């Protein structure tokens, strides 16, 4: 009975929290951990790899449920690194502090480290170009927990003239969109008008 009373009190407390106000700025600090699919530099089409990302997002609350802004993430993979800069829109379903949300991002990923093929061919790879994410999750007070999907553009470069130039010359060969799934935790700092 005592646990039931505590649970009921907790639910009443969460339900009585005030909604966020229109006109606020929200600074979000986030960390992602996920799995990247289909990276060809390992020589297997269905290879998967772990990836992590951290970064800030700055949003403006334009209504009780909608926030828009910009952000950047530092994404690290064991073979390469990249920095996406993106526009962000977050829509919350409800006006309570505890509510589900959907978030959409689109932007450009800048390569920070290239990866050499591990299957013996002389090609190099980078994540560079188109970047997008869709995140579905739940906000509890200042914290967001979510699961997301991501599409990034992977560029492949072939090594030309390795006998003439030391290390050869990299020549762009083609683009491929690569998917990923990830879990995200974020903490939101709210600033008044």
List PLM regions with ranges.
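Short glycine/proline- and aromatic-enriched beta-strand/turn motifs that initiate or cap beta-hairpins
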Residues: 19-60, 180, 184-193
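Gram-negative (and chloroplast) outer-membrane scaffold detector with strong preference
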Residues: 55-118, 126-135, 140-142, 178-193
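Positively charged n-region of N-terminal signal peptides that target proteins for export
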Residues: 1-4, 20
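Feature marks short, surface-exposed loop/turn motifs that line or immediately flank catalytic pockets
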Residues: 35-37, 76, 108-112, 151-155
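Outer-membrane beta-barrel translocator domains and adjoining extracellular loop/strand segments
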Residues: 39-47, 80-85, 113-121, 157-164
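Sec-dependent N-terminal signal peptides
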Residues: 4-14
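Outer-membrane beta-barrel proteins, especially TonB-dependent receptors
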Residues: 157-184
């Amino acid at each position: 009975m005592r646990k039931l009373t505590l649970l009921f009190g907790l639910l009443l407390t969460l339900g009585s929290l005030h909604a966020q106000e229109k006109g606020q700025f929200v600074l979000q600090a986030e960390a992602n951990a996920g799995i990247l699919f289909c990276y060809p530099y390992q020589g297997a089409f269905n290879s998967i790899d772990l990836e992590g990302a951290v970064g800030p997002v700055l949003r403006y609350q334009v209504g009780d449920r909608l926030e828009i802004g910009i952000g950047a993430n530092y994404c690290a993979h064991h073979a390469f690194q990249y920095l996406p800069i993106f526009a962000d829109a977050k829509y919350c379903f409800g006006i309570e502090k505890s509510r589900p949300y959907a978030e959409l991002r689109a932007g450009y990923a800048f390569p920070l480290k290239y990866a050499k093929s591990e299957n013996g061919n002389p090609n190099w790879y980078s994540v560079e170009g188109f970047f997008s994410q869709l995140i579905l999750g739940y906000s509890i007070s200042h914290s967001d927990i979510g699961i997301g999907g991501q599409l990034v553009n992977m560029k492949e470069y072939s090594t030309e003239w390795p006998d003439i130039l030391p290390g050869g010359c990299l020549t762009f060969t083609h683009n491929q969109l690569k998917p990923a799934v990830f879990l995200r935790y974020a903490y939101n700092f709210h600033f008044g008008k």
